[in-house]
Amino acid sequence: MGNIYTRDIKRIGQQIYELYKDQITTDYEKNKELVKQVVDVYSKKVRNRIAGYITRKAKQASRPVEVTEQQEELEE
């Protein structure tokens, strides 16, 4: 089971994702450096969680649309 992200992590991650969508990749290390440059994070743990959340969103966005269409067909 994975960890649940707090509201603050999600809010900050969503804002960074919307503002810097063109710079975000599916590579965690690159996203971690981006978060370090963009946000003045008070701890390494929070920075890493934000970077992980952004990476996960980027991977979800890069998934093919066909997968979601198949899921919709199964639900009907």
From Swiss-Prot:
Keywords: Ribonucleoprotein, Ribosomal protein. It comes from the Archaea. It holds the Pfam family Ribosomal_S17e. One of its GO terms (molecular function) is structural constituent of ribosome. InterPro entries: Ribosomal_eS17, Ribosomal_eS17_CS, Ribosomal_eS17_sf. GO terms for cellular component: cytosol; ribonucleoprotein complex; ribosome. Transmembrane segments: none annotated. This is Small ribosomal subunit protein eS17. It comes from Metallosphaera sedula (strain ATCC 51363 / DSM 5348 / JCM 9185 / NBRC 15509 / TH2). The gene is rps17e.
